[in-house]
UniProtKB/Swiss-Prot annotation:
Alphabetical keyword list: DNA damage, DNA repair, DNA-binding, Glycosidase, Hydrolase, Lyase, Metal-binding, Multifunctional enzyme, Zinc, Zinc-finger
Pfam families reported in the protein's UniProt record: Fapy_DNA_glyco, H2TH, zf-FPG_IleRS
NCBIfam families linked to this entry: fpg, PRK01103.1
Biological role: Involved in base excision repair of DNA damaged by oxidation or by mutagenic agents. Acts as a DNA glycosylase that recognizes and removes damaged bases. Has a preference for oxidized purines, such as 7,8-dihydro-8-oxoguanine (8-oxoG). Has AP (apurinic/apyrimidinic) lyase activity and introduces nicks in the DNA strand. Cleaves the DNA backbone by beta-delta elimination to generate a single-strand break at the site of the removed base with both 3'- and 5'-phosphates.
Catalytic activity field: Hydrolysis of DNA containing ring-opened 7-methylguanine residues, releasing 2,6-diamino-4-hydroxy-5-(N-methyl)formamidopyrimidine; 2'-deoxyribonucleotide-(2'-deoxyribose 5'-phosphate)-2'-deoxyribonucleotide-DNA = a 3'-end 2'-deoxyribonucleotide-(2,3-dehydro-2,3-deoxyribose 5'-phosphate)-DNA + a 5'-end 5'-phospho-2'-deoxyribonucleoside-DNA + H(+)
Cofactor dependency: Zn(2+)
Species of the source: Legionella pneumophila (strain Lens)
Organism ancestry: Bacteria, Pseudomonadati, Pseudomonadota, Gammaproteobacteria, Legionellales
Listed InterPro entries: DNA_glyclase/AP_lyase_DNA-bd, Formamido-pyr_DNA_Glyclase, FPG_cat, MutM-like_N-ter, Ribosomal_uS13-like_H2TH, Znf_DNA_glyclase/AP_lyase, Znf_FPG/IleRS
Record: residues binding DNA: H91, R110, K152
Descriptive protein name: Formamidopyrimidine-DNA glycosylase
Gene name linked to the record: mutM
Keyword GTP-binding: no
Keyword flag Glycosyltransferase: no
Span of zinc fingers (FPG-type): 237-271
């Protein structure tokens, strides 16, 4: 699933082509996504100008002079800027035609994504209203995490992947951040010290910033708006490296299942706290 860096990379890629432009038409080829694409989306959007493009967690928001489009890439989705004459492929579900001859094309083979219209304040929509702070904001810091972790017996990895605690951190960047902070992923959140939270928040911010600069991480499905893969996969220290030697101590990378997800870690660099 695309995480914050991949969504931010996508937002940055489409922004120069869409902001300030007018939507001339919308073509919906398949409305059956996680939530149905509105059948009258063309009527809702035609003739409106895109005034801004922002990101909230893993969601992309297209602000129009009236209303908003809320987009989520799901497990396998991506957005491309294409010519309006470009032939659609099998999983190209929605085209947003712009008055500059280009189109925003939404592709989603597994159809877990979203492409919906919101009339009112989008930040009060149920999908956004309860999200935690952005990890690259000043609101996300060790004091905040320490306060939220009080009496939380869940694993620290599940804790930082909870979008109500902090948005945008999925399996890849949680594993990498915990490795750099030398924290075992199964450690109870309430046992993490202030010093460890200082280290963890710092590494989360640095990793996300580095991943954005690298265009995200492409392991299978993710491609940016210009069709290029993300290159942060070459910087991964533990994710996807089970049984390979740790790049720090040369012990074998192991995995443990936490909340149904395989979590990579180094047993030497990240000892469990009992």
């Amino acid at each position: 699933m695309p995480e914050l860096p991949e969504v931010e990379t996508t937002k940055q890629g489409i922004k120069p082509h869409l902001e300030g432009c007018m939507i001339t038409s919308v073509q919906v080829r398949n409305q059956k996504l996680r939530l149905p694409v509105p059948l009258n989306l063309n009527e809702l959007c035609e003739g409106k100008h895109i005034t801004a493009i922002t990101r909230r967690g893993k969601y992309i928001l297209l602000h129009m002079d009236k209303g908003y489009l809320l987009i989520h890439l799901g497990m396998s989705g991506h957005l491309r800027i294409v010519s309006q004459t470009a032939n659609p492929q099998k999983h190209d579900h929605v085209d947003l035609h712009i008055n500059n001859g280009l189109a925003l094309r939404f592709r989603d083979p597994r159809r877990f994504g979203l492409f919906i219209y919101i009339d009112e304040n989008p930040y009060q929509h149920p999908l956004l209203a309860h999200l935690g702070p952005e990890p690259l904001s000043d609101d996300f810091n060790s004091e905040y995490l320490l306060r939220k972790a009080a009496n939380k017996s869940q694993s620290i990895k599940s804790f930082i992947m909870d979008s109500q605690i902090v948005v945008g951190i999925g399996n890849i960047y949680a594993a990498e951040s915990l490795f750099l902070a030398k924290i075992h992923p199964n450690t109870s959140a309430k046992k993490i010290t202030t010093e460890e939270f200082n280290s963890l928040t710092g590494h989360i911010k640095k990793i996300l910033e580095s991943a954005i600069e690298a265009g995200g991480t492409t392991l299978r499905d993710f491609y940016s708006s210009d069709g290029k893969p993300g290159y942060f996969r070459f910087a991964l220290k533990v994710y996807g490296r089970k049984n390979l030697p740790c790049l720090v101590c040369e012990n074998k990378i192991e995995t443990v299942v936490i909340a149904g997800r395989h979590s990579a870690f180094c047993p030497h660099c990240q000892p469990i706290i009992t």
